[in-house]
From Swiss-Prot:
<feature type="disulfide bond">
    <location>
        <begin position="528"/>
        <end position="554"/>
    </location>
</feature>
<feature type="binding site" description="type 1 copper site">
    <location>
        <position position="1034"/>
    </location>
    <ligand>
        <name>Cu(2+) 6</name>
    </ligand>
</feature>
<feature type="disulfide bond">
    <location>
        <begin position="868"/>
        <end position="894"/>
    </location>
</feature>
<feature type="glycosylation site" description="N-linked (GlcNAc...) asparagine">
    <location>
        <position position="920"/>
    </location>
</feature>
<feature type="binding site">
    <location>
        <position position="255"/>
    </location>
    <ligand>
        <name>Na(+) 1</name>
    </ligand>
</feature>
<feature type="binding site">
    <location>
        <position position="419"/>
    </location>
    <ligand>
        <name>Na(+) 2</name>
    </ligand>
</feature>
<feature type="binding site">
    <location>
        <position position="761"/>
    </location>
    <ligand>
        <name>Na(+) 3</name>
    </ligand>
</feature>
<feature type="binding site" description="type 1 copper site">
    <location>
        <position position="294"/>
    </location>
    <ligand>
        <name>Cu(2+) 4</name>
    </ligand>
</feature>
<keyword id="KW-0915">Sodium</keyword>
<dbReference type="GO" id="GO:0005507">
    <property type="term" value="F:copper ion binding"/>
</dbReference>
<feature type="binding site">
    <location>
        <position position="949"/>
    </location>
    <ligand>
        <name>Na(+) 3</name>
    </ligand>
</feature>
<feature type="binding site">
    <location>
        <position position="120"/>
    </location>
    <ligand>
        <name>O2</name>
    </ligand>
</feature>
<dbReference type="GO" id="GO:0051087">
    <property type="term" value="F:protein-folding chaperone binding"/>
</dbReference>
<feature type="binding site">
    <location>
        <position position="128"/>
    </location>
    <ligand>
        <name>Ca(2+)</name>
    </ligand>
</feature>
<dbReference type="InterPro" id="IPR011706">
    <property type="entry name" value="Cu-oxidase_C"/>
</dbReference>
<feature type="signal peptide">
    <location>
        <begin position="1"/>
        <end position="19"/>
    </location>
</feature>
<feature type="binding site">
    <location>
        <position position="1035"/>
    </location>
    <ligand>
        <name>O2</name>
    </ligand>
</feature>
Amino acid sequence: MKFLLLSALLFLHSSLAWTREKHYYIGITEAVWDYASGSEEKELISVDTEQSNFYLRNGPDRIGRKYKKALYSEYTDGTFTKTIDKPAWLGFLGPVIKAEVGDKVSVHVKNFASRPYTFHAHGVTYTKANEGAIYPDNTTDFQRADDKLFPGQQYLYVLRANEPSPGEGDSNCVTRIYHSHVDAPKDIASGLIGPLILCKKGSLHKEKEENIDQEFVLMFSVVDENLSWYLEDNIKTFCSEPEKVDKDNEDFQESNRMYSINGYTFGSLPGLSMCAEDRVKWYLFGMGNEVDVHSELFHGQALTSKNYHTDIINLFPATLIDVSMVAQNPGVWMLSCQNLNHLKAGLQAFFQVRDCNKPSPDDDIQDRHVRHYYIAAEETIWDYAPSGTDTFTGENFTSLGSDSRVFFEQGATRIGGSYKKLVYREYTDDSFTNRKERGPDEEHLGILGPVIWAEVGDIIRVTFHNKGQFPLSIQPMGVRFTKENEGTYYGPDGRSSKQASHVAPKETFTYEWTVPKEMGPTYADPVCLSKMYYSGVDLTKDIFTGLIGPMKICKKGSLLADGRQKDVDKEFYLFATVFDENESLLLDDNIRMFTTAPENVDKEDEDFQESNKMHSMNGFMYGNLPGLNMCLGESIVWYLFSAGNEADVHGIYFSGNTYLSKGERRDTANLFPHKSLTLLMTPDTEGSFDVECLTTDHYTGGMKQKYTVNQCKGQFEDVTLYQGERTYYIAAVEVEWDYSPSRDWEMELHHLQEQNVSNAFLDKEEFFIGSKYKKVVYREFTDSTFREQVKRRAEEEHLGMLGPLIHADVGAKVKVVFKNMATRPYSIHAHGVKTKSSTVAPTLPGEVRTYIWQIPERSGAGTEDSPCIPWAYYSTVDRVKDLYSGLIGPLIVCRKSYVKVFNPKKKMEFSLLFLVFDENESWYLDDNINTYPDHPEKDNKDNEEFIESNKMHAINGKMFGNLQGLTMHVGDEVNWYVMAMGNEIDLHTVHFHGHSFQYKHRGIHSSDVFDFFPGTYQTLEMFPQTPGTWLLHCHVTDHIHAGMVTTYTVLPNQETKSG
């Protein structure tokens, strides 16, 4: 390929202009790694010793805490004879590689291991000969030498740090990574990963970022040793009776998942030490699989990320984040993952803040205002749905065939919809005799405790009385507290105050927290920050028992005397979670009280456990949440927060209206464990609308409510003058869809990886459906006769299963003439738009219906958005089944002022949907079973292998390199409109090889990985500069292996071509 050779020559020529060349000598070695090294000298963090033993103790069929791994080690020079020591806290990560923009980085890699590996870097520029990743990319000869480094071989990888990374709005130095990429998930699980720090030019002084005293790199990962290349070696070496090991046994597999930070678990990570008042930079990243939903909490500290104050950092596989803090409060503090499953499994560490007598700034808390709250924890019987009916369907909760029956059926071994719980409630004084009654504005709080609010400069005093039967506490977020006021206990003694963290039954304790400036909103934040408080004795059990409440921390002078925000009409607090009543402190009480045959209850039974997982908002399900009422044109603030585990990946969708969050216009907010958000909304359409979780299991499980917008303050009119109307003729058409029409790319990939693996999703075999399915898709037609389908142009080929790309400008209307050419009712509805009615009428088979979408200002980009932003449109007759049957497409809304015509660069746009299509939920499942398997009569729709085989990990409905048409030229300006929908497993960290992209988020930021979840729509802007065929994939382990990968091609520009 001539243009690739030319590209390489251009890079060599341009290297003369680079300011500095740096050399790193890295060897790939094999060693035994101890996940709890040094734990003999110090007590591990574990609520339950049995829990830590499960992961760390070896035995006849258990490996324990030591594993053979492959590691990146740094050497002094090219002789590879002397290693360079690294900080203890780096754990098994490779050495820190640092570069400033303009640097040429030469990484000399030698493989001392027993199998082939590579070195692949994120965030830097490289040619195909320096990519270090093996996949079918049309390269040959010398460009393939980097793809696989065999034992004993050495290779020089040449990387260049250049714009746009870091972006203009990024920190001076940002987090990137490098890892081996023969089979990336297996290589990484084996240990080959390390940090790469990219810095703006001139920001490093003696290899340290200026104005930073301490810096640390942390990887949060559930390291899956079952995927390691060395699993067999580890079984033979560390199991005392290896012949007894069943590698498919679920408990054995779980025992090999190490919930770790830099390869250390249960608090054994060494060396995180700093002085009070040190300016500390944390370079953080996640890695792993669908279970890797991380919510990192730095206890006792205030963090700044992208100019926002926060105390929780959410990380997913290949999420790359940097945060800064000024260390405060001398003592030993915990750094923990607040995913409740991870917390139990050991994903914690300690960091020490020492008093080094460094001068501290003057206390900025003057004219201290003390806000005093009297809060008790008390028992109550909580009904998740007091109306007894699903307000969305009008059905009784226990109707046969209803989604709700599994949760609300009460009987011999079922609890039903009411549970004994512990809740926080507010009282008038410390006698705790007169409970404060909630007013109409607080009706919606439901199970939540009272709102604790404060302004910057305030002192919060909470007198807490425990009326329950277990030790409890109150642990706040978003405020400052001393060790004596910390509501979370973590031993050994001396690290926590037992008095504050274990308030005994019938006892009272008064907490005091402060709100210094660094804990309050920044200039970029909203006026008030959404926060939460909860009991922290046993975080999992306490929260699931019901002990959680909302907080808001506001700018000074922004609140009225009663705590309401000035210039805001209404404030609502929403807590989305799957309350796992199996983890409740009161489970046994509930079994005794509500089941009719408690002695027959098997608490380990999966069906029993599922019946106790209550998908709720503020403790209500299926539209039973009261009090979400507002007026047209009012200024509304929503405070959202969540808690839970990896199942708690929420896309909270507000139908009928949009909101602003940090300058971005959206209608769906993504929540994760312990994440909180503040959303600003001005409702402009009258009616009853949905606020619901788009995660499909949560939606069907009842995490959906109604909010009502009324005309109540005179006439509120939409004054938008809609100019121009564009008409689209779109039909729902049933087709045979092939997720993988060619297996060539997939087969060549496995050949290059020297693996012979079957494919559970595409191999038809005797009972499985294979790659072809009957589906229904949106297709565009030329006119209202619906006789001639519009043929897709070359630049639209990439849309695949998606419906047509619909464009609209702010101030215009879109008229969709929709014909249902399928065999069952469907509709077409778009996110973000304004419609005359809050309901979307179904269109019956054979019918034609016209839908009008208005595009007011609030449908377009926010002040901090890209000029054009994507929304999704889909059918809403049955939101879940319609989606999985294939009905979804992109709507792109651009600002009025956005001019595309005069840009000298060629503008390209590609729309991508990352979705695990669950064909088990398709309307056409029975048709597909009858059509495609060789023996349909033998298929069992409840068989786990059959169910798994129908989950198609696709990009625009294509798998394993089958998505075609992602072609561009060097010098093009490319907009990627990326969307995600789906279920709990649909967390997608989208990674582009070869190029970084930019995105807007209160400034221009750069990365090569972006996180997507159900209801995430984002514009990514790319300026291709390096020719080649490049990998584009989801970085989640199972999704890579399941086929959520394709390639995009960058051709040389016209000048290069002609020259």
